[in-house]
């Protein structure tokens, strides 16, 4: 089944997007910026792979962040993102989870993105454990990331700094969440045959 599921996801990704696609903005200044951001983040090479994983996992997130004053894109698997607020059109707030191992400890960094009246607020919570399977206790973020503040505010920003993508497959397993399903979720028995 694994190979057939991968073939299905890869084929859908190829049908959805190819390197021949053109992304442009009417305003020349913004168009140049968008083109530069996409090029700097290997978008044309990485996006098809991201789409394939998103079809396999039921969704994915592209998160925007700054690194040394350069706009970066992070391609995140659906299982590393938990929506906390949404409307009929999009997910507007959520929590990202990243795992790290250092000095024999397992760390989980939770990054909570929330929209408030003055802009986007991002809160960081770090948890440390002796075991990979245990959530552990909260520790100061500076223990692993000395340069990272507990709270970051992007004043004036009124849109999420991420975009959630899900396959156009109705979620008939979890009705209350805006999450997608793997494109083959309803045909797993057939694929196993």
Locate each region found by the language model.
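Extended, helix-rich architectural segments
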Residues: 1-76, 80-81
């Amino acid at each position: 089944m694994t190979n057939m599921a991968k073939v299905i996801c890869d084929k859908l990704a190829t049908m959805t997007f190819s390197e021949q696609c053109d992304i442009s903005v009417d305003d020349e200044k913004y168009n140049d910026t968008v083109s530069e951001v996409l090029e700097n983040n290997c978008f044309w090479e990485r996006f098809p792979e991201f789409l394939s994983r998103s079809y396999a996992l039921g969704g994915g997130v592209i998160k925007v962040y700054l690194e040394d004053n350069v706009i970066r894109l992070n391609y995140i698997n659906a299982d590393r993102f938990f929506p906390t607020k949404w409307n009929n059109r999009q997910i507007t707030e959520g929590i990202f989870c990243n795992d790290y191992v250092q000095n024999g400890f397992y760390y989980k960094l939770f990054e909570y993105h929330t929209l408030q009246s003055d802009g986007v607020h991002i809160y960081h919570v770090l948890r440390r454990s002796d075991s990979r399977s245990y959530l552990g206790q909260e520790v100061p973020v500076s223990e692993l990331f000395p340069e990272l503040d507990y709270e970051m505010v992007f004043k004036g920003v009124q849109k999420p700094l991420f975009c959630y993508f899900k396959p156009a497959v109705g979620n008939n397993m979890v009705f209350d969440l805006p999450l997608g399903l793997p494109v083959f979720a309803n045909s797993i028995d057939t694929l196993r045959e």
